[in-house]
Design a protein with these regions (language model features):
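Eukaryotic phosphoinositide-binding membrane-targeting regions
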Residues: 1-100
Length: 100
């Protein structure tokens, strides 16, 4: 079943899409360091990230300094929610670079 999933790679690339499995978001040579699910909160201009990838586990944000986000998502804040309700403000904690 196609679901809204995201991954992050060791090179700092953030990729999301409607896929069956998180590994479907990988490109050749990517090393995934976690993923999860997402939804858009248009009221607060946020992309809400949560849960974890069955394939790759929870995102390992601590391994990154820069997150490369598709430019189409410019203007959205990225926020990850852990299972215990703790919030990690990705947009505040990491340097965000946009790519086309």
């Amino acid at each position: 079943m196609m679901l809204p999933k995201f991954i992050i790679t060791m090179s700092g690339v953030f990729r999301l899409g409607m896929v069956n499995q998180h590994k479907d978001l990988l490109k050749s040579g990517d090393q995934c360091i976690g993923g999860g699910y997402y939804h858009f909160d248009y009221t607060s201009n946020r992309i809400i990230l949560d849960r974890s990838s069955y394939d790759f586990g929870k995102p390992k944000w601590h391994l990154l300094e820069v997150l490369k986000v598709p430019s189409v998502y410019r203007g959205f804040r990225l926020v990850y929610f852990y299972d215990d309700g703790r919030e990690f403000d990705v947009s505040r904690e990491l340097q965000i670079e946009y790519y086309d």
